Regions:
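A residue-level marker of the well-folded mature domains of exported/periplasmic proteins
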Residues: 1-249
Length: 249
């Protein structure tokens, strides 16, 4: 069997580096690493590289440094299906759309944004009038939406890179009496799924975090057993809507 040691960084890249130093003092066989920030991760990863300890990144990539494998949701595809659903919901009339981005420098935000824009940028009638950074935070998502509604009162839809920001946008829309706005989030957390059931959110992209966790451990096990492992693995995501939830129930 294996002994699992966990450290949490609380979204703090500096704490993450301290955690890595503490972890390396234990001389682990392999490290599973979910970076706070893809850019800042390079310096933290360098500590493990210099120590000769193999690292598998999970969920977010490190933009520099060496890893033996990377495992994450297919965030590009997730952003794309969210964008396609918004296009479908707006129909031929199209309309003005808001994008609330995740934290700058994270691969999840970059990839979800990429997929979203692949879906909407070339669609006639769709105009992304606001694309601001909400840092995965509900209050920031709400503020972005409040400001967007003031500047663009005819907004028809929102894509938020996570459900937390989507819920903030939803509350801003409710306060403005704009429950008609199509809002799509990402993560399928419990509050968002309930909001989809209630018709307050149009949809949310569901990840499979359990597979990321078990898949990371499986990759580490195979590596330690001397087996060849994939350099990169994408985990499937799906769009959850009210119709789908009614069908599942």
């Amino acid at each position: 069997g294996y002994e699992l040691v966990e450290y949490g960084a609380d979204k703090d890249a500096a704490k993450e580096m301290t955690n890595m130093e503490d972890l390396l003092s234990l001389n682990p066989d392999v490290i599973l690493y979910n970076p706070v920030d893809s850019d800042a991760a390079g310096a933290t990863l360098a500590l493990a590289n210099d120590a000769g300890i193999p690292v598998i990144t999970v969920d977010r990539v490190a933009n520099s440094g060496e890893v033996i494998s990377h495992l994450a949701s297919d965030n590009v595809y997730g952003g794309k299906i969210a964008g396609e659903y918004i296009v479908e919901q707006l129909g031929d009339d199209g309309g003005e759309v808001v994008e609330i981005q995740g934290q700058a420098g994270t691969s999840a935000a970059r990839d979800r944004g990429q997929g979203f824009h692949e879906a909407v940028d070339d669609v006639e009638g769709i105009d992304v009038v606001v694309s601001d950074i909400g840092n995965w935070d509900k209050a920031e998502g709400m503020t972005i939406m409040e400001n967007a509604l003031q500047a663009h009162p005819d907004i028809k839809a929102v894509f938020a890179h996570n459900d937390t920001m989507a819920m903030g946008a939803m509350e801003a829309c409710q306060a403005a009496g704009r429950e008609d706005i199509v809002i799509v989030g990402f993560d399928a957390d419990d509050d968002a799924v309930q909001a989809v059931k209630d018709g307050k959110l149009a949809g949310t992209v569901a990840q499979q975090p359990e597979l990321m966790g078990t898949g990371g451990v499986d990759l580490a096990h195979d590596y330690l057993e001397g087996k060849e492992i994939e350099k990169s693995t994408a985990i499937e995501v799906t769009l959850i809507t009210k119709i789908i939830l009614l069908y599942l129930l």
